Amino acid sequence: MPTIANQHKTWNFIKRSLLLFIGLIIVGCKSQENSITFQSMDTAMTIKSFGKNSKKANLLAQKKIFDLDKILSAVDNQSELYALNHSCGKKFKPSYELECLIKFGLEKAEITGGAFNPLLFPVTYEWGFTSKNFKLPSKERIEELLLLTDYKKVFFEDENIFLPEGMAFDFGALGKGFAGDEAIKILADNGIESAVLDLGGNIQLLGKKNGTENWKIGLRNPFGGTDPSDIVQGSVPLALELSDCAVITSGGYERYFTADNGKKYIHILDGRSGYPVENGIASSTIIAKNGLYADYLSTTSFILGKEETRKIWEKAGDFEFIMIFSDGSISYSSGLKDKITLLEKFTAEEIIEK
């Protein structure tokens, strides 16, 4: 694969215009805006919208996200999901929102053969990613807990769900995407035609910037303490021009721990093995119309790797993807050729064609 020439000088003007957010970088709209920043779903969030009714719309969207957090938190003992997870196999009637996520998650678990699995809470908790009491579980303990993640044992009867005792859902890989979709709907219903949502690094775009041009956003450099490439740590390695879509990235560069054996373990687990993913991917980004779909695919693509993601992309045809690898190389789908600009020197560039 060809080495990419350094484009620092050529694109300095673009890089200076980028505003850093938590997981992505967004070029702000210069017209009048209304913005609200708050904490929900265990992360910082910002909603920016533009238009006559933007202040009211932002508050309504914020309220919806707060309401969803009360439904979907796996650790809040007052949440609906917590109640379901502790229903001890008895019938439970979920809300519309919770039912949507359960059915979506179970469907995707079936499609991926359990690689993506919304029932990994017992395993995630054992690793300490939920409690932050990190530890390296024994192989025997992982195998024992995997018995509690069999998505085929969960079933609906009329409006009720039956979740076997000891099993527990965790929608950390879906919740923010779903919340973004719901917030976008509220903004649109209130007459907003242009908005940017940053939900803990999940970016969702409504319409175009100023109603006329694409938004410029940039992916965060996924490399941590040691950088195997020439990419400058903390830089903006690439920019995208997009509108009316979700841009969601999965990576192990923010949530991880180093065990006593000196090995780094990231929070993204392969549902089939119960172990953190180790496949050379530093980050995987999905661009799709729907935030829930993009959230699911960003995690799934990170787990399955480039070739399996390529197969899904070729078959589905309704998303684009970018993968940055630990060796400093980059691969991205051909639908992004006219939308992506590399701002840093990658060790290699691959454009994936159908």
Question: Which positions does each model-derived feature cover?
Answer:
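Hydrophobic h-region of N-terminal signal peptides that target proteins for export
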Residues: 22-28
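Mature catalytic core of soluble alpha/beta enzymes
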Residues: 2-17, 28-354
